[in-house]
Amino acid sequence: MGEIMKFYDREKELNYLKTYCQLEPNSILFVYGPKSSGKSTVMRRVIKELENSNIVFFYYNLRKYATPTRDEFLRVFFEKSDKKYLLNKLELNLGVCKFGIEENFDFNNLCLNDVFAKINESINAVVEEGKKPVLIIDELQKLKNIYFNGGKSLLNELFNLFVSLTKMEHLCHVICLTSDTLFIDEIYRNSTLKNASEYYLIDWLRKGTIRNILKEEGFSEEEINYALDYLSLPYEISQLINNKKLGLSVEQTIKQWINVEKDGLKYLIDTTDLDEEGLYNVLSKFKDKIKISYDKEVKKEEMKYLKFLIENEILFYDVINGIIKPTSIIEWHAIKEIINAMQ
């Protein structure tokens, strides 16, 4: 799949993030959005497009780790070297850096203050060279359950460090990517971060964009009009294109996708201890509309069902705009089919 295709018309997002990286650091930026909406892809593109600028990117991708341990965190973030920062070997094609740490440094007896001192040293080394450091952490919520000696939560302490690096000292941008919206909810309500964070939504692809891509890929007007009622995520487009090459009709592909999501959702409901009726009641809010307002349409007793559906990535909760919707339009159709089958 060509580079150009993936980025078809993410201009608005690209421009926002590129500009953001070039402004003076003043807050932590949380980039959030439904699963697979293309957050990492856009971010990597930003890094690529700014590779000849005076920005040094520290980019850490935690999606590869189920639940990283303390040691994994240290090995991911630091590299033994006589330099204060060096190229990240895990991301060679991106040309991003990681923090350097002395050869004789003992990872086992590291306290959080040492960790933060090292991060500070690396960032200051970049600034002293007249360059701008930008720290990007993809799937930051994976660090949630890491504790250092004295039971200190790594994530909470990191937030304090990030506030200091951005809002207080204006040294370094910190950009955190996540599709875990309950995590964004926690952050949104976290007092440390109250006036120190901003949020940016990377949502479904716009319909006009999808139409242009499919047109360019040689789909007929009829196929495009059919597909537009169902597509919302970048990877769906590339799969649809591949399936067409393999001889599957647009309709067949989309029906298959809906069935897969429907079976997955049914299995989820059948295997949970939560009350089935409660779950179906919440799902039936989406029978005739694709999004609901958290304020106006959610009762307290429905919260546990909603939380369960959000945790399992059936629903997406846009905390900042106060709306809840399925994670994709395909998921919405799966929900509607399940609701209709119940009646």
From Swiss-Prot:
SUPFAM superfamilies: P-loop containing nucleoside triphosphate hydrolases. The keyword ATP-binding applies. This is Uncharacterized ATP-binding protein MJECL26. One of its GO terms (molecular function) is ATP hydrolysis activity. SMART domains: AAA. Disulfide bonds: none annotated. The keyword ATP-binding applies. PANTHER family: AAA+ ATPASE DOMAIN-CONTAINING PROTEIN (PTHR37096:SF1), YALI0E33429P (PTHR37096). Pfam families: ATPase_2 (PF01637), MJ1010-like_2nd (PF21690). InterPro entries: AAA+_ATPase, Archaeal_ATPase_domain, ATPase_dom, MJ1010-like_2nd, P-loop_NTPase, WH-like_DNA-bd_sf. ATP binds at G33, P34, K35, S36, S37, G38, K39, S40. Keywords: ATP-binding, Nucleotide-binding, Plasmid. Belongs to the archaeal ATPase family. Signal peptide: none annotated.
